[in-house]
């Protein structure tokens, strides 16, 4: 993997440094064994490994950016999906690629088309495409609503993948009955929920997703776990009830279809 330039890194990190992005970057780094760049939040020392923590009194390292493979294909993809030309150019490797980038044919892409492509990247297990969508999420051209939908999809996918996503894909490929798949689906999400109960205190951005999983299992202790207001609890419960009613208790062909259905109906 090739490093982004220092200038590009600082530009992206300064604009988009937040907890949600940090957790996504961290899991992307684990998932694809990318090099990662850490920065000490106290002395601003930068190191390409986490060994900096041994050299500094401040142990609170902030994961700045996963180093993404840059090429013209990624650049053109970002551009065709609606990223600004300035943002897309950050992923060109050299001047020649920048010159080859035709910014005159930038098509307006609907939210539904972007989410459809994102879903296909899940189903095809296309790692570079998924990373590209994450980068697209950082582009400032998109509406807040679409940004949140994309973020929800990616968080969902990555955590599921860390749990037992590959196992699910094996079952899915064997054409098990819908009822069997549903049992497997619940088993996966129960493991996911137990992990989220621990993670949500560290990453508050996952709270809504934790509600979703908790109420799916009718776990009333979710209220105590997250110390939330009554209004927050009621809002989430109502959304889950609506989702269960609309999808027949979420009898979906796969976890991917399930998450895509949420994003398409603007529940989050």
Curated annotation (Swiss-Prot):
The chain crosses the membrane at residues 176-193. Residues 1-175 are cytoplasmic. Keywords: Early protein, Glycoprotein, Host membrane, Membrane, Transmembrane, Transmembrane helix. GO terms for cellular component: host cell membrane; membrane. It comes from the Viruses. Induction: Expressed in the early phase of the viral replicative cycle. Residues 194-268 are extracellular. Glycans are attached at residue 227. It is found in: Host membrane. It is a single-pass membrane protein. Belongs to the asfivirus MGF 300 family. Plays a role in virus cell tropism, and may be required for efficient virus replication in macrophages. This is Protein MGF 300-1L. It comes from African swine fever virus (strain Badajoz 1971 Vero-adapted). The lineage of its organism: Viruses, Varidnaviria, Bamfordvirae, Nucleocytoviricota, Pokkesviricetes.
